[in-house]
Amino acid sequence: MFEDEDKGKQPDNAWGPRRPPPGHDRYWPTVVAEIAYSETPSKLNSDVRFWLEGTGRNAQAVVTLIIDQKALRITVEKWQPQNSRAHRAQRITISKMNEQTTVEGGSLVVGFQELFLRPSDAPKETDFELGDQRLTLLATIIWEQQEQERELKELKKKKSGSRN
């Protein structure tokens, strides 16, 4: 649980350097993931603002996944602080129609410096990038999980109906 002056928040996932540079809170994440499956857009926007608009926070990016429960569509957004406000820097849509998955909006990129709060100083210290192939894999895993949940609900419904 991460807390500021007036409220606390548990992210769906979060990352940051083990040893941040001086002046940065080592317990506050630099990159946060928030996933909206049943949340309202206003709740998700509130979560993004919590991470990016407070004083003294290290969060450099918030990645949101908005999972459509009716259509095979996932929207990935990357938010960053800009002039002390949350600004959407990137929007990617992953959708599936007629067994064809489409990724629009390019690769999701989280910069090395956003995550570690310092420039890279070695060839292996690179940006984190999820291209079309990995985004498609992520979406496929989510959609398979959604299908399993639907099947489980139907099975429970049939079982409870047969008892009556």
Where are these regions (language model features)?
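C-terminal interaction segment
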Residues: 1-164
